[in-house]
């Protein structure tokens, strides 16, 4: 959420040389469903956080509010209508769904009345297709393309604090929550 302070494991995908960002020790690759922090393509001074949807070589499509990976529709089950509070209040009334990527289930928000960017892309080697869980209010790979491996900062794993300015302070319920 807006206002989250995130803990990131910068070594999840390998050890890199500072400044030139070259990987010197490979400790693994991003997996579908990982929540990853990366340098924004259009302004590398900004870090973005999104979910890995497409891996190198994947064909990723987004049609009628559903993700397709290599021609297979990703499972999505409706849960309830989202009741946002504080900084999440602007999405109140969105459909809260469980989405299953590989073996990882996570929540997403869908606003049926909002138009969505639809289309298909083949993820180039060394790149990743990223999407936000707030599907109809997310600036992600549907708009600016795939993320090159060298832009990866690390894997997000917990929210250590949230500053909710609209509720005048710390959102105590989010402290220490794990990111799935």
What is the role of each PLM region?
Residues 2-180:
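Soluble "head" domains of membrane/secretory-pathway proteins
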